[in-house]
Amino acid sequence: MAPSTIGTNVAGDKYEYDPENWMAKGTSTLNNGNGTKGTLDVDLPERHPETGINVLVVGAGMGGLMTTLECWRKGHNIVGILERNDGPVYSGDIIVIQPSAVSVLRHWPDMMRDMEDEQVNAAVSYEQHTGRHIYGPTVPSFNELEHLASRKGPFVAPAQIREKFYRMLLRQVAKLGFKVQYGKRAVSYFEDIAAGKGGVVLESGEIQVADVVVAADGLRSTSEILIAGEHTPTKSSGMSIYRTAYPREMAMKDETVRKRWADTKEIWEYWLGPGMYIGVFFSEDVVSWGFTPRDTHGGATESWEPDTDPEDVVKELLRVPDWDPAIAALVRTAPKGAIVHWPLLWRNLRREWTSSGGHVVQLGDSAHSFVPTSGNGATQALEDAITLATCLQLGGAARNAPLATKIYNLLRYERVSCAQKMSFVNSQLKTETDWDGIWADPIKVRTRFPKWIHNHDPEDYAYAKYGQAFAHLVAGADFANENFPPGHHFVPWSIEEVYADIEAGKKVEALLDGDWS
């Protein structure tokens, strides 16, 4: 990592997380896809009985790595982890991961300790763009006392440093004895139902097969062609985001920045302006900001290439008058070559995430994209991984794996759909702010982290609902999910419908039935 930038789109050392670097001397990697429990210096979870299900993971992002870990713990054979990049890519900066996604870490002592040591328990505050204070400092709603008492897993701070969280997953994968195969780009997926296999064709012409192929390779995964026949088209939100992270000491060289934040150790502030907002994060060693304006130029692309000049961001910022001078000063402290410009694009959610025979299954962004400002993309990808591994365990054998993937799909689709709709609620909250309502009751400005999301345990839910889902798919028995807002009558929706409501001046939050709090 370059000293002046954090989380840039450059492949790291592909050998850093080779198993031999993380295992005690004299231990070796097994070749049958079961990893190893021969390490002396790690604390591994108890592994469930082997199922004999061979799983090939395509994509070594957070969803793919959690799939690897949980599939190993649930007794499945990991026959490969394929990644298109030439090494681990530490793109990204500060992320929100909600408790539902990491309750499973109670089974992974090393990762639980790592997360608790490395996360940032920043206070959260809300400001008007002029500098007028709105609300805070406070905690995210998922850390209110009423929710902490019964929580399984680690304490979850408001902010995770993406690179640190991702390295935690890479370390744990290496400790199991698995090696990510880099430079392996999937160009097409297939399945042979008669043979009971799914497969992937790589750019090199190599073919790999398994009982279950997990497409965790992100946006525009070629698994879409097998499953849906086409890539899901995008629709612009009319917004984009500029994001960056760099050492705190660089920001503190500016006098105006020092005056505002020098005495602040750990804070996450949201500054709300007309049609735009900026999130500002400070830890003891990192500063990060994400500025979300109207995308007036349409020049942003879905790429983590840090190719934006800070002065261009300042120009966008100052399209709205009366910003507190500290914000423009902070933006100018970003080093050149450290700012990513990303469009906020929506994709309608498809109901089907598996191939017809169930041997190829999608998770994370390949199944359901979330815009980077949603605070939910990583959470739902990790929930996917936990759910899929548990469903395969309950399937119990390779011959039952295709039905297990379809049960996973059934358990996840409606919940993810509702989570995506919450992204619109939070977007309107920050860009179409009801100031009369906020000044009358400032707590209403808080980012929405609903109980039905953060109090969920995807592993327990899969255990509880698998049998009912099985009966529904096999025999047509009634089935109802319970992992979305209580009292909500689920109806599939489209981005076009939501935008029609927004353009009619309606608040998405006001149109929601049931308890979305």
UniProtKB/Swiss-Prot annotation:
The active site is at R243, Y270. Its EC number is 1.-.-.-. Its cofactor is FAD. The keyword Flavoprotein applies. Pfam families: FAD_binding_3. The keyword Flavoprotein applies. It is an enzyme of class 1 (oxidoreductase). Keywords: FAD, Flavoprotein, Monooxygenase, Oxidoreductase. Pathway: Secondary metabolite biosynthesis. FAD binds at V96, R162, D365, A378. Gene3D superfamilies: FAD/NAD(P)-binding domain. InterPro entries: FAD-bd, FAD-dep_Monooxygenase_BioMet, FAD/NAD-bd_sf. GO terms for molecular function: FAD binding; monooxygenase activity. Belongs to the paxM FAD-dependent monooxygenase family. FAD-dependent monooxygenase; part of the gene cluster that mediates the biosynthesis of the dimeric xanthones cryptosporioptides. The pathway begins with the synthesis of atrochrysone thioester by the polyketide synthase dmx-nrPKS. The atrochrysone carboxyl ACP thioesterase dmxR1 then breaks the thioester bond and releases the atrochrysone carboxylic acid from dmx-nrPKS. Atrochrysone carboxylic acid is decarboxylated by the decarboxylase dmxR15, and oxidized by the anthrone oxygenase dmxR16 to yield emodin. Emodin is then reduced to emodin hydroquinone by the oxidoreductase dmxR7. This is FAD-dependent monooxygenase dmxR9. It comes from Cryptosporiopsis sp. (strain 8999). The gene is dmxR9.
